[in-house]
Amino acid sequence: MKYILFLFLICVSTLAAGELKVVSISPALTELICFLGKEKLLVGRSEVCNYPESVKKLPVAGRLAIPFVEKTVGLKPDLLVANDLVNPGVKAALERSGINTLVMPCRSMADYKKCVEVLGKELNASEAAARELERIARWENKPRKKLDLKILWVVWDTPLLTPGRRALLHDIIVKTGAENATGEFDQEYMRPSFDKLLKKDIDVIIWSASSAGWKQRRVWQKFSAVQKKRVLEDLHQDSLLRPGPRLPEAVDNLMKQLEKWSAK
């Protein structure tokens, strides 16, 4: 009798997970849900959730971290998945409508691993989650050679914004074997002065800002990285800036691009 009851509970649990309807308004978490083999559960996305390509056919239920309450409620999801930038008042409104809201920070690889674990349990994808955690562990523990490069990663230029050591971009630079030029600051992002940066003898500039013609500005012409044409601008932003399944490969590709300038 106990064995029959056990089988019944397993079937009910599996059925419940199979019928779950999910809205994700975080691009990184949308990618993760699909990577875990649970894309079929998605009934809505944010307007910036664009990978894999197949999710673009889903209804748009919000912007990044901003769910459209009426639209989301109309999709009748059981669960909304978002990062921790969601307004608490909006979260409360959705929960009053009967929608469970799972809010998780997703700013680092440590956050990503926690998201893998949590979504693995919530979406009945524990085996896929375990495989992903093993894959990430192998990647993190892989031997890497040190690159003799000091990197300035420009997130924005007006005002100037660069990563401190709490930022995902700092982790990425370190994983390539290089040094983050503004990694001594114990914060996520910072606004350094040009005078201090010029004293650091920057080897490479990674440019994620959208400004055109920036290299012609007099202040940037003073950097040896610009003078030597050691600038990376055409990186695949989504795979690098989202802590998700594609990040390890994106970091390895970045490392290969940086290697040509190491020890030169």
Language-model regions: role of each:
Residues 20-33, 127-176:
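Basic- and aromatic-lined ligand-binding clefts that recognize polyanionic substrates
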Residues 20, 110-121, 130, 141-143, ...:
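Structured C-terminal subdomain patch of bacterial secreted/periplasmic proteins
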Residues 86-96, 199, 204-223:
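A ligand-binding cleft/hinge motif common to bilobed small-molecule-binding domains
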Residues 69-76, 97, 191-201:
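Short helices/loops that flank or line small-molecule/ion binding pockets
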Residues 21-85, 181:
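A short, structured surface patch at a secondary-structure boundary
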Residues 3-12:
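Sec-dependent N-terminal signal peptides
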Residues 46, 168-189, 209, 233-234:
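His/Asp/Glu-enriched short active-site or ligand-binding loop at hydrolase and phosphoryl-transfer sites
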